[in-house]
């Protein structure tokens, strides 16, 4: 099942109709459930310029196996710029909440990879900023997820450990660091930040592991619920980590975190 986020398509900033994109959600339900269960809204990575398939549908199927509904959001990327992706995430959360009865959905987590994890954090932690210009039934629901799963996340866009390419693609190449740095997510942790599960590999050459450690440290400093796993070896973008005996355990660990630490119900 697929649902579009809006009844209309917002034109690409490039002015090229071929680059117009209507964001949508692919739905992967757990079949046969008799009561509402938790779900994960998956945000594939791609540096805010693409969306990686291996960080989408295969992740959804794995979380179905773990007893959770799953949803994959195909959000807008460059040439669309901030706040288009964040608006798409918040809209998706609201739409899914508005359909909770039909979907048998209880709590909802966002699960993002790399730049998709930056989107998960920014769209969740700043959800109230990204309302739709035209109100409808879905807009009456909260756009803030109940938990976050951040997989080898881009957290900073401008610090010495930042992934600068994501910031440039999100804001545009001529945007000053003072503007881009407003979405360095480690600086925005507060008492409303939801329970968060993070994992990374120590020698990730694409997005430095410090993105994860700094965010986790700020979560703990704020007294917030955060679980961090650093695996010793692995490249950036490993997705499910198949063929890696340690890394491939992360979905099980994340599923247990949702159930035991964030109060999610599973099938």
Predicted regions and their residues:
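Short beta-strand/loop motif that positions the catalytic acidic residue
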Residues: 192, 198-200, 204
């Amino acid at each position: 099942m697929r649902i579009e986020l809006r009844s209309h398509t917002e034109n690409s900033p490039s002015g090229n109709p071929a680059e117009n994109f209507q964001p949508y959600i692919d739905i992967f339900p757990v079949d046969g459930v008799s009561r509402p269960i938790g779900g994960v809204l998956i945000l594939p990575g791609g540096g805010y310029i693409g969306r990686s398939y291996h960080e989408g549908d295969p992740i959804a199927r794995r979380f179905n196996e773990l007893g959770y509904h799953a949803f994959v959001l195909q959000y807008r990327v460059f040439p669309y710029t901030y706040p288009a992706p964040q608006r798409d995430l918040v809209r998706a959360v609201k739409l899914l909440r508005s359909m909770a009865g039909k979907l048998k959905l209880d709590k909802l987590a966002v699960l993002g990879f790399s730049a998709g994890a930056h989107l998960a954090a920014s769209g969740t932690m700043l959800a109230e900023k990204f309302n739709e210009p035209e109100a409808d039934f879905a807009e009456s629901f909260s756009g803030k997820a109940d938990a976050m799963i951040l997989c080898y996340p881009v957290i900073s866009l401008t610090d010495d450990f930042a992934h600068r390419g994501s910031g440039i693609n999100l804001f545009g190449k001529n945007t000053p660091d003072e503007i881009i740095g407003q979405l360095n997510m480690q600086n925005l942790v507060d008492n409303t930040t939801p329970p968060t599960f993070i994992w990374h590999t120590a020698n990730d050459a694409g997005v430095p592991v410090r993105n994860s450690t700094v965010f986790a440290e700020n979560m703990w400093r704020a007294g917030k619920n955060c679980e961090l796993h650093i695996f010793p070896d692995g490249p950036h973008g490993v997705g499910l980590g198949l063929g890696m005996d340690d890394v491939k355990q992360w979905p099980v660990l994340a599923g247990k975190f949702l159930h035991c630490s964030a109060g999610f119900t599973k099938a």
